């Protein structure tokens, strides 16, 4: 069964490493908050009302983070960078799809 808890379990390693991302439980679902370094203001906060919404958001965030790490923010993203990031994302998708069965 797909649950918010399973999404958090799948992305635990990523969330532990990315100090600017935080996921908070709230009355409407889960809120993904992005911080900007040590600023007391967040960059954004996006509500996910379903586990699928949270999964897709975190997968996108993970992919973006992976591309930044690959380029170190100093060069354009190449096709190979995108291919490697997609391969890593595929393992998350496979774990998520296992929850349907």
PLM feature spans:
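Acidic, low-complexity, intrinsically disordered interaction modules
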Residues: 25-92
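Residues that form generic nucleotide/phosphate-binding pockets
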Residues: 10, 14, 57, 95
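Short intrinsically disordered terminal tails
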Residues: 1-2, 94-101
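Compositionally biased, intrinsically disordered low-complexity segments enriched
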Residues: 23-24, 97
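Negatively charged, low-complexity tracts enriched in Asp/Glu with abundant Ser/Thr
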Residues: 1-21
């Amino acid at each position: 069964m797909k649950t918010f808890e399973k999404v958090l379990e799948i992305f635990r390693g990523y969330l532990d490493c990315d100090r600017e991302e935080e996921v908070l439980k709230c009355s409407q679902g889960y809120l993904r908050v992005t911080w900007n370094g040590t600023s007391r203001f967040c960059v954004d906060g996006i509500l996910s009302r379903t586990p699928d919404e949270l999964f897709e958001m975190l997968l996108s965030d993970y992919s973006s983070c992976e591309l930044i790490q690959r380029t170190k923010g100093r060069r354009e993203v190449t096709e190979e960078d995108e291919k490697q990031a997609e391969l890593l994302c595929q393992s998350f998708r496979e774990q998520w799809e296992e929850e349907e069965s």
